[in-house]
From Swiss-Prot:
One of its GO terms (cellular component) is cytoplasm. The active site is at residues 122, 178, 211. The keyword Endoplasmic reticulum does not apply. Hydrolyzes fatty acids from S-acylated cysteine residues in proteins with a strong preference for palmitoylated G-alpha proteins over other acyl substrates. Mediates the deacylation of G-alpha proteins such as GPA1 in vivo, but has weak or no activity toward palmitoylated Ras proteins. Has weak lysophospholipase activity in vitro; however such activity may not exist in vivo. This is Acyl-protein thioesterase 1. Belongs to the AB hydrolase superfamily. AB hydrolase 2 family. It comes from the Eukaryota. InterPro entries: AB_hydrolase_fold, LYPA1-2/EST-like, PLipase/COase/thioEstase. It catalyses: S-hexadecanoyl-L-cysteinyl-[protein] + H2O = L-cysteinyl-[protein] + hexadecanoate + H(+). It is found in: Cytoplasm; Nucleus. Keywords: Cytoplasm, Fatty acid metabolism, Hydrolase, Lipid metabolism, Nucleus, Serine esterase.
């Protein structure tokens, strides 16, 4: 398998004090930064959009496409129990390790872990949530749009002993009409996250929303980011990443 292409980066406009790593879903790209920038938001935040490697996806008849892990089922076939039975554990762990590498790169650049937020959409959200739960660094926050919990039956095996992110804010959002990752799967995943001991999990639902994002959901996400990585710029210009 070829390594993923380098991430797409939107540098901070002011002094770089925080980073948001946003991962796409199966085969797509996710970019909200430009819209927020046009509104004068998150000027001191660098946005990193990682690219998934090209892998065969079983549910797409083995076709090679960008993916964070293999999937054997989608839609009404992808429920909590079937997800446990058909998990691509090596793929999940490979992507988690890559996300942790991106986090470490930001820390090495001087960004505090508490000013790093990890999240994404669909598959990217699932890996972001798993990475956030199991990360050895205390992150600022984690979000997942149309997300689901991977390796839930083995999750405790991967949680660090001191569990740095037990109290980290997690924001989960899901459309009630999602036809790819069903709402019930997302809802149950959020409940499972609370059951294992996460103390700050917010789960919001959106009527008439399928497997996509809408303006209300994006506004809720923006408010979450404003809360967990508030501005602390001193007015200096950014040197970029």
């Amino acid at each position: 398998m070829a390594p993923p292409r380098a991430p797409y980066i939107v540098p901070a406009l002011k002094k770089h004090t925080a980073t948001v790593i946003m991962a796409h879903g199966l085969g797509d790209r996710m970019s909200l930064a430009q819209n927020w920038r046009r509104r004068g938001m998150f000027d001191e935040v660098a946005f990193i959009f990682p690219n998934a490697p090209m892998i065969p996806i079983t549910v797409n008849f083995g076709m090679t496409m960008p993916g964070w892990h293999d999937l054997t089922k989608l839609g009404r076939e992808l429920d909590y129990e079937s997800a446990i039975r058909h998990q691509d554990e090596p793929g999940v762990l490979r992507s988690r390790d890559y996300f942790n590498t991106l986090i470490k790169e930001q820390i090495d650049k001087g960004i505090k872990p508490s000013r790093i937020v990890l999240g994404g959409f669909s598959q990217g959200a699932a890996i972001s949530v798993f990475t956030g739960i199991t990360c050895k660094e205390k992150l600022g926050g984690v979000f997942g749009l149309s997300s689901y919990l991977v390796l839930s039956d083995k999750l405790k095996n991967y949680i660090p002993e001191n569990w740095p992110n037990k109290k980290t804010p997690f924001f989960l959002a899901h459309g009630l009409e999602d036809e790819i990752v069903l709402f019930d799967f997302g809802d149950l995943s959020a409940k499972k996250m609370k059951e294992i001991g996460l103390e700050d999990v917010t789960f919001k639902s959106y009527p008439n929303l399928g497997h996509s994002a809408d303006p209300v959901e994006i506004e809720d996400l923006a408010r979450f980011l404003q809360k967990v990585i508030p501005p602390e710029d001193d007015g200096q210009a950014s040197a970029g990443l």
